[in-house]
């Protein structure tokens, strides 16, 4: 019986590192570059991480909620800017955690990352936890984002937030 318990512990110890493996850095690079560029307000840098083809698709909580095609990124950015002005949003920032799921089949990949969007709304710090789901394809220039979604509940005042 003791042998079985030790064998089970060894199996768990060997399996644990396999579950904790980090995704391919090359696969994650365009996602991280997109978020970094977004946080800096670098629209061109963020757009460069996305494919500019007919299959580019973005789904976000900002009206009209869905953008498709070669100009999807630019149209989404314009809608986001317009909504931010309408809502009195400033200081947008997205942070990501390690992916909770990655699937790769040759030159195509699917990645889910937990994300948090923080901003100020009329001066009040806000926080919105969500998940971002990405579809990427690898071409001659490397991995590019071909689609993504933002999914989560509505933002709430950040912990301890008070109006200015």
Regions found by a protein language model. Name each.
Residues 86, 118-127:
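Short, cysteine-centered beta-strand-loop-beta hairpins and adjacent loop/turn segments enriched
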Residues 1-7:
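Bacterial N-terminal signal peptides that target proteins for export
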Residues 47-104:
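A solvent-exposed, acidic/Ser-Thr-rich amphipathic alpha-helical stretch
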Residues 93-94, 106-115:
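A short hydrophobic beta-strand element
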Residues 34, 46-47, 69, 73, ...:
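Hydrophobic pocket/interface hotspot
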Residues 110, 127-160:
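Short beta-strand edge/turn micro-motifs at domain boundaries
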Residues 9, 16-49, 156-164:
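Short, low-complexity N-terminal intrinsically disordered segments enriched in polar/charged residues
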Residues 73, 96-102, 115-117, 131-137:
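Hydrophobic/aromatic beta-strand elements that line small-molecule binding cavities or substrate pockets
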């Amino acid at each position: 019986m003791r042998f079985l318990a030790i064998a089970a512990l060894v199996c768990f110890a060997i399996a644990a590192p396999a579950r904790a493996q980090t995704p391919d850095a090359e696969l994650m690079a365009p996602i991280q570059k997109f978020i970094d560029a977004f946080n800096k307000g670098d629209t061109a840098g963020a757009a460069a991480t996305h494919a500019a083809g007919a299959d580019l698709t973005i789904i976000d909580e900002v009206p009209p909620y869905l953008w498709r095609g070669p100009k999807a990124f630019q149209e989404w950015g314009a809608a986001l800017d317009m909504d931010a002005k309408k809502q009195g949003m400033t200081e947008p920032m997205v942070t990501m955690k390690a992916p909770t799921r990655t699937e790769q089949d040759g030159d195509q990949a699917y990645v889910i990352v937990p994300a948090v969007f923080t901003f100020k709304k009329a001066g009040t710090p806000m926080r919105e936890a969500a998940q971002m789901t990405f579809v990427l394809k690898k071409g001659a220039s490397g991995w590019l984002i071909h689609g993504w979604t933002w999914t989560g509940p509505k933002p709430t005042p950040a912990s301890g937030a008070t109006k200015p």
